[in-house]
Amino acid sequence: MQVFIYHTPELTPVHTLPDCAVVIDVLRATTTIATALNAGAEAVQTFSDLKTLMQVSDTWQPEKRLRAGERGGAKVEGCDLGNSPLDCTPDLMKGRRLFISTTNGTRALQRVEESPIVITAAMINRQAAVNYLLDKQPDTVWIVGSGWEGGYSLEDTACAGAIADALQEQSGQMAIGNDEVIASIALYRQWQNDLLGMFHSCSHGQRLLRLHCQEDLKYCANIDSLDVLPIQKEPSILVKL
């Protein structure tokens, strides 16, 4: 298994795809997706465009759908939810489909959606992603951070490093595909005992603090707290494995 890390979807190779893509948006899309599926959502359907989200979700009965929209960290008017994983309670999610569009994570999913296998990961379900990769042993793995509007994201890179670090420790056979893997592991090891402190330091974490999302940051920092793996059933649709 050869692992590559790309800090943003824009940095991935253009004319090829991996055997398995792991998409990360720690703050907060992939944390929310994992939480929604763990809480009983039937599926999570992702959109980069809010207008398309509204059109597609309109074809569903209101009691069977939830719309989650976020731009710049804030909830989009007309949606039921923003992008807070804390809103994904079993009472709200059970049996419903979550239609979601976020600033960054949904764009990263779009870039790799034609890969044979697409999964999503965050700090909270890191080990579930690692277990899947160790079990399936895909030849090539891309771990793709969502970044922020095309730029580098500290927390996504640290999460990618957390996955690569665990793969290396637990298998001993992971091949390093690019230098970003080495750098990401080093970054994760620097912050592994203070993930919340890292979230408070990084630019997107500070953005969320200004929006009074302190509890979201605490939740997103709970590494290996959920044993759930979102996997793509068809392009843009994720289900619980």
From Swiss-Prot:
Keywords: Hydrolase, Magnesium. This is Probable 2-phosphosulfolactate phosphatase. InterPro entries: ComB-like, ComB-like_sf. Belongs to the ComB family. Pfam families: 2-ph_phosp. It catalyses: (2R)-O-phospho-3-sulfolactate + H2O = (2R)-3-sulfolactate + phosphate. Its EC number is 3.1.3.71. Its cofactor is Mg(2+). NCBIfam families: PRK00886.1-5. GO terms for molecular function: 2-phosphosulfolactate phosphatase activity; magnesium ion binding; sulfopyruvate decarboxylase activity.
